[in-house]
């Protein structure tokens, strides 16, 4: 039975992450030459088959290849220091596609990688708040749903990344409402799950757990934060017991923490 491990992490800038030690602190040049950074430590300790990063903020391909993964694909923005996603893997992709049909802005927010048994859609949804709520709900979300539905006609889909949405009140503990927690954005998220017959893997395995993927250090110390990062998988996979792990990992260096998905499925 094949076993696949995926990790997703909004790293809030690849350049800065490569200078962080495993505790999230900044390293000087001398330390960086002799000590593994937090991203290298994560990859070495967890050994993901597929690594999905968001908000890499690279305008051109970085020389850093994650632990010499065989295949590394980027979708980069033309705007310096903004957005960008990356998928690194030891598995040979069959195809790679960028962006979403119907979305004119080229912000490097989506990359779709096809493997033998499934697609991985690595996504960094826009955090736009009330100023562009209409765009988020009426343009971005429908385009993402259509993209998933088209791919589903061929094989299963793993949608992962920072989707910038708080599905329920169980998924946040904050003193004020943040973008992503509006009624409209929540409705769009659940519409995606319903119309694509998909499930939130973490919530499926941990229906009552309060745990958060986003929040600064001072927020974490107070038990505050929000769950903005997800692995969305076919409901049929969840019901068949294909998901054997979906949880958060304690690695620092970003305002997000990484999440991991473990799959065990029959060929």
Specify the residue positions occupied by each region the protein language model found.
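Active-site beta-strand/loop signature of hydrolases that rely on acidic residues for catalysis
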Residues: 6-10, 39-61, 120, 147-171, ...
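Structured beta-strand-rich core segments of catalytic domains in phosphoester-bond hydrolases
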Residues: 56-128
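Active-site beta-strand termini and strand-to-loop segments that position acidic
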Residues: 89-90, 113-116, 223, 234-235, ...
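N-terminal, active-site-proximal structural segment of metallo-dependent hydrolase catalytic domains
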Residues: 1-66, 77, 82, 267
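Metal-dependent phosphoesterases centered on the DNase I-like endonuclease/exonuclease/phosphatase
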Residues: 141-228
